[in-house]
Amino acid sequence: MNDQPFLQFDDLQEYVATRLGSEGWITVYEYTESDRQKIGYYCALVAPDAVSRCLENTSWDLLIGHGMPGFSFYPDGTHRYYRFGDDDGVEPFIIDRDFHGLKPSYKELSEEFRHFHNLYEDRRAGVFIALDDNGDDVEVVRTTPKRVQVRAKYLKDYLAARGMHMLLFFEFDRWSEKSLGELGMEKQDEKRQESDYRYSRWVAPWEGVTNPSRKTFARIIGKKVIKGTENYRPSMGWGRENQQYEDFIIGVDDDGNEVHYTSDEEQLANYFGKNPGSPHYLTPVFFRKSVMAKYYNDPAKYRVEDGHVYCGGYWSLRLDNSHRDYVIVYLGDLGKLSHKEQLYWKSFNVLPDGGVSDVAFRRGILGEWADTDEPALSFKANYERFRDGWRKKHGWDLFKPLKPEDEHYWGTLHVPASENQKEFDDQVMALAKLLVERLNEREVAKYITVGPNEKGIAKFEKYLEAIGFPDRQRFITLLRNLNGLRSGPAHVKGRDYQRAAQHFDLEGKGLSHAISGLLVEATAMLVLLGSFSHQREPAKDDE
């Protein structure tokens, strides 16, 4: 192996001159060591007019551990406080927090940088995260105990906003077990400076004080200037200056070809005479039902409600999700989504097929109040209404709230868009959680005589009989068969599952229609029991 290029830093000289500071991720702190080299990176911020002074030498203008608040004391007995310890205009970006071995040390990222980009720290993953205009996570900083890297775009935007430059300090040590003579080399001492970097490089004999096996030592030390984004313009966060608008299918022409039109509301007509002859803002755009899978599958981030989908508090989209076959969104509303989200919706765009649902028409056009008739949305609305009404009437919950670890079942409950067995099993599990597992057995037991080994549904059957609910057998049959279907995903699909599958006619109806029918039946039972419960109040069993 020829050690000369390695010890002369041929690779690093080219790297410093060209790529250092211009890659997608910039290492702003590192202290690592391997068998043959030691790597050190650090950084600091300086004003542009201080750069020439800093490039007069290769020394680091800020040492690791420095840059903390402090005082300067003067001969006349006065003193002055400095935010970063002195008045040389050098500002730390990575702060080494050390507590003299009494507490764990750690690296702290500039508070102003964190606040500027509103970064969230995920300490478990060792990353700082920003939210893009779609509400999606973007890793901005990656940290380990020995390395900190920053995404270049976010760093350079920050530098531009501050009107500052970054000095990226570097120091590499390399060594060899061969002497200079054995390597065919001589001592070297080189200094190099350009407009944006300066370094010193040398190769010398190593006396072997700390490690006798090392006979040759090489070092390169210096700094490079990283500037902010050119022509940086801060965003107002709500303007149109960077928005992109996708075209969507809005109909067909006389030959049956698809007609597309932009979702930019500035090019759409409205009821006030804007852009006459253009498609209206309220032109319905049709999408496959499967467009909603993304939102149902991530309930921690998204919330699907009757007529809306929400991404936390970041954005929302008005939609018609009461339609039997499609999800429908007005053309102008699509333009309010981020471009990334528009592209997602566009991939599910289909030709118009009729109009909006009756529910959406009555609400949006006629201005009437209308309950949704979409099975999952209707079930959720009636389930909440039932629980509230029951609690007000009786003072206790018939269906207890979901456990925190099960709350996602509520957000993911929907009618599957396809005949997917796993998706079907997930919806069955969600319904079983809500209607069977969360039955308040303790309260129900106060009104009946509980037999040996009687469980939730059996107790509930006795309770319904005790209060004289006329449709109790229909309700209990529904719950028993729902529990039977649940035994499929929960266990092995055995006899109980087969019996329930036959009851709900899974083979004849298909999985999606079966869930739809199950939700409709469950909703009907809640409405009947809710209405009945307001008429009668059972007396507690005295036995």
Role assignments for model-derived ranges:
Residues 2-318, 332-481, 514-521, 525-543:
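Amphipathic alpha-helical interface elements
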Residues 473-502:
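Histidine-centered, metal-coordinating catalytic motifs and their short helical/loop contexts
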Residues 501-509:
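Acidic, Ser/Thr/Gly/Pro-rich intrinsically disordered interaction regions
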